[in-house]
UniProtKB/Swiss-Prot annotation:
InterPro entries: SGNH_hydro_sf
This protein's encoding gene: Pced1b
Family membership: Belongs to the PC-esterase family.
Name of the protein in its database record: PC-esterase domain-containing protein 1B
Upper classification of the organism: Eukaryota, Metazoa, Chordata, Craniata, Vertebrata
Signal sequence, renumbered to the chain: none
Residue segments, region Disordered: 386-433
Source taxon at top rank: Eukaryota
């Protein structure tokens, strides 16, 4: 799994406008991105649980939250924004995938000074649990209306990533679930909610793919990571959200043709030495065994840039557990040349990473992470892949044949998939269900 430092995330999202739309799970997605743009540390449990605060890590509450009233009704609103010299990240809290409020959000994005470069979105749990017995059928219709409107409103350069809803625990105590009251529909059971979420994920994936939007299957990625669920069975801890951020950032980099640093997973468990909210600092440990990659005390650890600078050929040390070949003269492995991927154009140039052409659009193929995941700092390593190690990457779905660069000196930029123009009949408007 790709692991990035704050300095590398700042470069990747340089002059980018990122919009996050969703419920409280995606509020934590927004918070982790904002934190990772500034610090190499994880969210604290308090930061994950707090909602509607006036400020979080130098962001600003723009609407709702503590500026209004904190509650769990379907009309709850919360709009947050983090803005620096070269980064803009905004969050909109949603309780329904398409509604009059969502329409107002789309109009705001369309009329703003800066068009969004990335939209990260999911809405599912509220939709299938708070809107009556026919909530699933309404959800399907609203998804069709949403993606149709997205086709009309979003610029072709905008990358929309639809996230599937994450897995649920066996016991759900989330406060947003409806209670038995006043003769309305009864409280939904855990089994029924899980079944509805599965059906909603399948349908949203198909609908997003039909409209040529990207899908990141979070339900797949976290299906074996339930130990990172919070006690309410819905929300996730700081380690899960950092992995989620890495998945999203890797997806963006792949879409923009940016090559990220490759750090092989050889160190012990990340959680053994980093606690929530602790800035990443390399600490000595006695139980690590042979320090194959131990940094010299006179040479402090410095993370590599997104593309390694050219230098002397480096022969990588052998990995533990792999058979060592007999000593022999090895040809040098030249590193990639330094390429300027991140320009200093005016703030929020929405087409910074794109080259528009009429060539066939690219795609992603499916990948899989197996087992649990961990996080830890990585030393600089040469651009060399031992034959006994196989890297893995995010599960993404595009529906277009993927294009691979033919060499380290090839042009890495790739066209974004162009959505076919949608022509809606005059005078007809889709309305929220």
């Amino acid at each position: 799994m790709v692991r990035l430092l704050a300095s590398e995330v700042q470069q990747l999202l340089h002059n980018k406008f990122v919009v996050v739309l969703g419920d409280s799970v995606h509020r934590a997605v927004y918070k982790d991105l904002v934190l990772l743009l500034q610090k190499d540390c994880l969210l604290t449990n308090k930061q994950l649980r707090t909602k509607g605060e006036l400020s979080f890590e130098k962001d600003q509450l723009k609407m709702g939250g503590e500026l209004d009233t904190l509650h769990n009704r379907t009309d709850y609103r919360e709009v947050r924004e983090f803005c620096s010299d070269h980064h803009l990240v905004r969050f909109y809290f949603l309780t329904r995938v398409y509604s009059e409020y969502m329409e107002s959000v789309l109009e705001e994005l369309q009329s703003g000074n800066h068009a969004p470069d990335v939209i990260i979105m999911n809405s599912c749990l509220w939709d299938v649990s708070r809107y009556g017995r026919n909530s699933l059928s309404s959800y399907k219709q609203n998804l069709e209306n949403l993606f149709g409107r997205m086709d009309q409103v979003l610029p072709k350069s905008c990358l929309l990533v639809w996230n599937t809803a994450m897995p649920l625990g066996d016991k759900i105590k989330a406060a947003f679930l409806p209670q038995k009251c006043k003769g309305q529909y009864p409280r939904i059971s855990v089994a029924t909610l899980k079944r509805k979420v599965t059906q909603a994920n399948l349908y949203s994936h198909a609908e997003a793919t039909k409209h040529y939007f990207d899908v990141l299957d979070l339900n797949f990625h976290f299906r074996q990571a339930r130990k990172h669920l919070q006690g309410d069975g819905v929300h996730w801890n700081e380690h899960a959200h950092r992995k989620l951020s890495y998945l999203l950032l890797a997806h963006m980099a792949d879409a923009w043709g940016v090559e990220l640093p490759q750090r092989d997973s050889w160190e012990p468990d990340f959680e053994a030495w980093e606690s929530s909210g602790q800035v990443e600092e390399r600490q000595p440990q006695d139980n690590l065994g042979p320090q194959v990659f131990a940094p010299s005390p006179h040479c402090p650890f410095r993370p590599p840039p997104l593309l390694p600078s050219p230098g002397l050929p480096i022969r990588p040390p052998p990995l533990l557990g792999c058979p060592l070949p007999q000593p022999q003269q090895m040809p040098p492995f030249p590193l990639y040349p330094q390429v300027s991927y991140f320009s200093s154009d005016p703030v929020f140039q929405s087409d910074e990473f794109y080259i528009h052409s009429d060539s066939p659009p690219p795609t992603h193929t499916g990948y899989a992470f197996e087992g649990d995941f961990s996080f830890y700092p990585q030393p600089p390593v040469p651009n060399f892949r031992p034959p006994c190690h196989q890297r893995q990457a995010p599960v993404v779905h595009r529906g277009f044949p993927r294009h691979f660069a033919r060499g380290p000196y090839s042009n890495p930029w790739r066209d974004r998939p162009r959505r076919p123009p949608k022509h809606s009949p005059a005078g007809l408007e889709s309305r929220p269900q």
